[in-house]
Swiss-Prot record:
Protein name: Transmembrane protein 179B
Organism, as annotated: Mus musculus (Mouse)
Record-linked PANTHER family: TRANSMEMBRANE PROTEIN 179B
Regions that span the bilayer: 9-29, 65-85, 98-118, 162-182
Keyword rRNA processing among record annotations: no
Modified residues (Phosphoserine): S206
Length: 219
């Protein structure tokens, strides 16, 4: 059974959301790993001779939250895609009003989590970069990732990875907002499609009562 066109567009959005969420989670995890498991967001850099070092990292749970939220939502998108592909090929692909309400609640929660994660990435990266630039060793974060860090091998492409994670999160936010809009439209269409049926049932009931009453009066 073919899926409605609105739901097909919704699944395309979730496909893109899966890619964005997975990319954000992977790049942030890679950045945290390059700092030895420390979270550079809102961190403080310091000079160690002629090298840079992460002196005051944030709690690792901050990066875990951002990467975890992005990863879990990406996994949800992937499972949702598998479910609807299976349903459209094997079973009935109809989604009822209760399913739509649940989808709306999940989308609203996802939008909140992604918005919080994107803001953490934006302001956390800016705070860390400002602490680096204030040392007057480099003029930008993109240049700082080319500078030597202590310990050796630390901060490999950290700014590029953080920038990619942030951009992916903002794009992911837009995709989820569009998905929420499509789900709301499906709820509206489903509600309006029930009204003519209910009106028709009432007319049928009235006609039936009239016929029954007419038959009883003759008998």
């Amino acid at each position: 059974m073919a899926l409605p066109w609105l739901q097909r567009v919704e699944l395309l959005l979730f496909t893109a959301a899966f890619l964005c969420g997975a990319l954000a989670a992977a790049t942030l995890t890679r950045t945290q790993g390059s700092f030895g498991g420390n979270c550079p967001l809102y961190g403080v850099a310091a000079l160690n001779g002629s090298s840079l070092a992460l002196l005051g990292p944030s709690a690792p749970s901050l990066c875990y939250f951002v990467a975890g939220a992005s990863g879990i939502l990406a996994l949800y998108c992937l499972l949702l895609l598998f479910f609807w592909v299976y349903s459209s090929c094997i079973e009935d692909s109809h989604r009822g009003s209760i399913g739509l309400r649940i989808a709306l609640a999940i989308s609203a929660t996802a939008i909140f989590l992604i918005l919080v994660s994107a803001c953490i990435l934006r302001f956390g990266t800016n705070s860390f970069c400002n602490s680096i630039i204030s040392l007057n060793l480099t003029i930008s974060c993109s240049e700082a990732q080319k500078t030597s860090w202590t310990p050796s091998g630390t901060a490999v492409q950290f700014y590029s990875n953080l920038h990619t994670a942030e951009t992916s999160s903002w794009v992911n936010l837009i995709l989820w907002c569009l998905a929420l809009l499509l789900q709301a439209m499906q709820c509206k269409f489903k509600a309006t499609s029930y009204q003519p049926q209910e009106r028709g049932d009432q007319e049928w009931s009235s006609e039936t009562d009239a016929l029954v009453g007419h038959h009883q009066s003759h008998s």
